[in-house]
Structure formats: structure tokens, C-alpha cells
């Protein structure tokens, strides 16, 4: 009976882990990655479209991203969209493709990025703890309604804590990996 509460809780917690991964993908490290441009929207005949829908993105060198528009007249709107996205990148074009050179990050900027990442990590941990609290409240309500016994409640609470601990360990692992990547010179 209580397994459904734990299954639902686990699904919500896993979503929180995935959200953190996605947020970290958008963080600029010393290495070029096309995921930096995931949120860039280009005005394509009046419709906001993602960059990958109007151009081919590639990483030919560790600090360079190239964007090859499928239509040459899209170079201007793509450059404008990149500048408006405030990524700290200046596009340069040769008429056929746009080149983004990522300058190396300063030590100070790296520390700022890590500080922001730690805040994101903490926000996700708070979300996980809130999910845990809701699950425990649901379990206590089930016990109060006599849907589960007191022994089942204790067993379920232990299981909830075990799942929560493993999810928080996952969040810490993701942070440690990304922090290492950012601090790498």
C-alpha cells in the first residue's frame, strides 16, 4: 500500500536530479559545448525557434563552437540571438558559418561559477527534502486512516530516508563532477 507513495516520491526526486543535470549543462566551463546554446531562440520567419532547428552546431576545437545556418540569410538573426542571450560570447562570421570562441575563464570567474553551482545544488536538496516531508506526511495520514499499520509506517519511513540519502548523494556527486570540470584549467 505504502509502496505507491515511495514510488511517486522517488520519481519526483529523480526529476530534481535531472533538472540539476540540465542546469549544469548550461553552465559554461573552460570547454566548448553546444549545450551552452540550448536556450538560445532565433527569430525564424516570426517564430522563435531553437538554434538547433535552424543550423548545425559543432565543436571543432576545445574552445570553439561553429554554427552553420541552413539558410545563409539566417546569419544575422542567429548572431543577434546569441548576443541577446547574454552568454558573454561574441559571434564572428565569414559569410557561411558563425564561430564562437570561448575565452578561458579566470580563476575568479571559476570560483563565482562554483558558488552559483553550490547554490543550485542546495536548492535541489531543499526540493528533495520537501518531497520527503510530503511523502512522510502522506504515510502518517495513511496510518491515521488505518490504511497501514504502525510497523509498516516505521518501515516506510526508513525506506523514504534511504531513498532520500541516495538522491542527495547523487546530487553531491553531480556537483563534485561539474566543480572539477569548471576548476580544470
UniProtKB/Swiss-Prot annotation:
Chief place where the protein resides: cytoplasm
A biological process from GO: cytoplasmic translational termination
Membrane spanning residue stretches: none
Subcellular location: Cytoplasm
GO cellular component: cytosol
InterPro entries, sorted: Ribosome_recyc_fac (IPR002661), Ribosome_recyc_fac_dom (IPR023584), RRF_sf (IPR036191)
One Gene Ontology MF term: ribosomal large subunit binding
Keyword annotations of the record: Cytoplasm, Protein biosynthesis
Superkingdom of this protein's organism: Bacteria
Role of this protein: Responsible for the release of ribosomes from messenger RNA at the termination of protein biosynthesis. May increase the efficiency of translation by recycling ribosomes from one round of translation to another.
UniProt family annotation: Belongs to the RRF family.
HAMAP family: RRF
Alphabetical list of NCBIfam families matching this protein: frr
Protein's recorded name: Ribosome-recycling factor
Naturally occurring in which organism (per UniProt): Trichlorobacter lovleyi (strain ATCC BAA-1151 / DSM 17278 / SZ) (Geobacter lovleyi)
Amino acid at each position: 500500500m505504502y509502496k505507491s507513495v515511495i514510488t511517486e516520491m522517488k520519481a519526483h526526486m529523480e526529476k530534481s536530479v535531472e533538472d540539476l543535470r540540465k542546469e549544469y549543462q548550461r553552465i559554461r566551463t573552460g570547454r566548448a559545448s553546444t549545450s551552452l546554446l540550448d536556450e538560445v531562440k532565433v527569430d525564424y520567419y516570426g517564430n522563435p525557434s531553437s538554434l538547433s532547428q535552424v543550423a548545425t552546431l559543432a565543436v571543432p576545437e576545445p574552445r570553439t563552437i561553429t554554427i552553420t545556418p541552413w539558410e545563409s540569410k539566417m546569419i544575422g538573426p542567429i548572431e543577434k540571438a546569441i548576443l541577446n542571450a547574454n552568454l558573454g560570447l561574441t559571434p564572428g562570421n565569414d559569410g557561411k558559418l558563425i564561430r564562437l570562441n570561448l575565452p578561458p575563464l579566470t580563476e575568479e570567474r571559476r570560483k563565482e561559477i562554483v558558488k552559483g553551482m553550490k547554490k543550485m545544488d542546495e536548492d535541489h536538496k531543499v526540493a528533495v527534502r520537501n518531497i520527503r516531508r510530503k511523502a512522510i506526511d502522506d504515510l502518517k495520514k495513511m496510518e491515521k486512516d488505518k490504511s497501514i499499520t504502525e510497523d509498516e509506517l516505521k518501515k516506510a519511513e526508513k525506506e523514504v530516508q534511504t531513498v532520500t540519502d541516495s538522491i542527495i548523494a547523487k546530487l553531491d556527486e553531480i556537483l563534485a563532477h561539474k566543480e572539477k570540470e569548471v576548476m580544470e584549467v
